[in-house]
A protein has these predicted regions:
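Acidic, Ala/Val/Gly-enriched low-complexity intrinsically disordered segments
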Residues: 2, 12-15
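Juxtamembrane inter-helical linkers in multi-pass membrane proteins
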Residues: 23-32, 257-273, 312-332, 375
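Juxtamembrane non-transmembrane "cap" segments at the membrane-aqueous interface
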Residues: 254-266, 353-377
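Short terminal hydrophobic/aromatic SLiMs and anchors at protein ends
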Residues: 5-6
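Generic multipass alpha-helical transmembrane bundles of integral membrane proteins
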Residues: 192-307, 316
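Signature of multi-pass transmembrane helix bundles
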Residues: 15-69, 75-245, 369, 375-423
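Hydrophobic alpha-helical bundle architecture
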Residues: 119, 283-286, 300-368, 385-395
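Central hydrophobic cores of alpha-helical transmembrane segments
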Residues: 125-135, 243, 254-256, 321, ...
């Protein structure tokens, strides 16, 4: 018997050592790739621009948070406590918040332009900076319009600004060799051409065809299966990391998809009935893989609170409250997360971890799936409990969060020590 127990402990130790070595290799490879990416001019300019835009973004994020929790008609606290607040000009307030989101993107484009052209040793940056600032306005806003879609299109803004900067660099270098005034007619022609492209793209991105198609796709029964949920857990962090805006169903409460509605109808008809879709985006992905936003980044805010660098501690405190309510934009700009391989790997790992544990707990009947509707801004860490009234879900949530902290910790430790792009 003692030999059997000893042999078992030896096998466990071998497995543990194997996974430990594999983890170290993955972290080292990811860190090397991250350092390679941080040598790219466009990435350097983008990361610096995001960090410099962070104060304005913080104002925007907290204003939206107050609106979502208290001011809007379907705000979380208004719904939970049945408050009857009469707030004048609610619609105008929402419009102002939408405009503020676009203004953040405009500042991001202008700051990126100045940073990138400085790296390119271009001295006359006023016109291209102003052009990309106005171009972003024309890209997202039409005459008398406010955006009714997700404006978190960071990749689009950075790419268009990058192309504009490169065209200005070569235009100035090879066409305008006599170094005319910054607002010479030949440069104004270039600016007009860039703005014309932005206006043309505006009519393409405001079309709802793509967004409607994605919403319809996510309502497909495929995303109630194990493979479908795993696919979402990998693709969603990847797209968010790339700076591509995600459908509402992947960043907020997807209680309007067909599977959730059918489950709710079944429960309301007969509380003891078998659910047609016990595993779906709402009961698995949102409830267990979205803590703090895409990639379960609430763990990052928690880790940063204990960082040895004051700057990172401040970022952790600044981002903690929005992260509790599923908003990780401050982390996205503050670290930044954009195009950083070092942060993509743990984002996918934690997202997959939450999906695997949540899915397993539901199919083994360890917990009840979330079927009851919750307000849109409900913290994802509470959806499993509030949507099922099953206290065991809180235990699963705690386990997933603790494991997420363990996964993120070595990556954040390396990120904290990497300041090459800041230099």
């Amino acid at each position: 018997m003692e030999l059997i127990i000893t042999h078992m402990f030896q096998n466990v130790n071998i497995v543990f050592q194997y996974w430990s070595d594999m983890s170290k290799k993955i972290i080292n490879i990811t860190a090397k790739l991250d350092r390679f990416v941080l040598k790219n001019r466009m990435v350097i300019a983008a990361l610096l621009a995001m960090q410099q835009t962070l104060p304005l973004l913080a104002i925007c994020v907290y204003a939206q948070l107050i609106s979502q929790l208290i001011l809007s008609p379907n705000a979380l606290f208004v719904t939970l406590f049945n408050w009857r607040l009469r707030i004048p000009a609610t619609f105008q307030l929402q419009e102002m918040l939408s405009l503020l989101e676009v203004f953040v993107l405009m500042i991001l484009a202008a700051t990126f332009t100045k940073q990138y052209l400085s790296i390119r040793k271009v001295t006359n940056t006023v016109l291209p900076t102003l052009t990309n600032f106005l171009g972003t306005y024309f890209l997202f806003l039409g005459k008398g319009q406010t955006p009714t879609y997700d404006t978190s299109q960071y990749l689009l803004v950075i790419l268009l600004s990058f192309i504009s900067c490169e065209s200005f660099y070569f235009y100035q270098k090879f066409i305008s060799r006599d170094n005319p005034q910054p607002f010479a007619s030949r440069f104004l022609i270039w600016a007009g051409f860039v703005l014309l492209i932005d206006v043309s793209l505006h009519f393409a991105i405001q079309r709802s065809v793509v967004r409607s198609a994605l919403s319809t796709l996510l309502s497909n029964n495929f995303f109630t299966t194990f493979i479908g949920l795993v696919t979402v857990s990998i693709v969603a962090p990847l797209l968010w990391w790339l700076g591509i805006g995600l459908p509402h169903e992947l960043i907020n409460n997807p209680s309007t998809i067909n599977a959730v509605i059918k489950n709710l109808d079944t429960i309301l008809t007969n509380t003891n009935a078998t659910l047609p879709y016990p595993t779906n985006l709402y009961s698995v992905y949102t409830a267990f893989s979205l803590f703090g936003g895409v990639g379960s980044t609430l763990a990052i805010s928690f880790i940063l609170l204990f960082s040895v660098r004051k700057k990172r501690q401040h970022l952790g405190m600044l981002s903690l409250l929005p992260s509790l309510f599923n908003s990780n934009q401050l982390l996205y700009f503050g670290l930044p997360i954009f195009l950083r391989p070092l942060l993509l790997v743990p984002m996918i790992m934690t997202s997959l971890l939450g999906t695997l544990i949540g899915y397993t707990a539901i199919v083994t009947h360890l917990i009840k799936p979330a079927t009851l509707s919750t307000p849109n801004t409900t913290p994802s860490s509470l959806i499993g409990f509030l949507g099922s009234n099953d206290s065991w879900s809180l235990l699963i949530t705690t386990i997933i969060f603790a494991l997420s902290v363990i996964i993120y910790r070595p990556f954040i430790a390396i990120e904290t020590s990497e300041v090459s792009y800041e230099k």
